[in-house]
Amino acid sequence: MESRGSIPVMSLQQRMRISRENAGLNQEEMAKKIGIGRATYAKTEQGVREPRRGELLAIAAITGVDSHWLATGEVPEVGEH
């Protein structure tokens, strides 16, 4: 994992996995919640497939993470959203 100063930089796939795991979901449960198959979701977490915007928004809503952070890895400034 790269770092920017003392802040580790995670890939989109790492952010997706960590968000899912912190929500207590396995890949199959997350896939069902966002309306895709488990194998498709697994390919997305592995970086073989790019997630669709709607999938990222759904993952953010389900896991409670900021959608901008999930998509970009950037923490929005206070008052930005």
Residue ranges and their predicted role:
Residues M1-N22:
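A short, Lys/Arg-rich alpha-helix, primarily the initiator
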Residues M1-P8, A61, H68-H81:
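Short, charged recognition helix plus adjacent turn
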Residues Q14, G24-L25, P51-G54:
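Residue-level signal for the short linker/turn that defines the boundary of a DNA-recognition helix
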Residues M16, M30-A31, Y41-T44, L70:
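Conserved hydrophobic/aromatic packing and binding residues within compact polymer-binding modules
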Residues E21, K32, A61:
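Alpha-helical residues within the helix-turn-helix
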Residues G35, R52-W69:
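DNA major-groove recognition helix of helix-turn-helix/homeodomain DNA-binding modules
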Residues G35-P51:
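Recognition helix of helix-turn-helix/homeodomain-like DNA-binding domains
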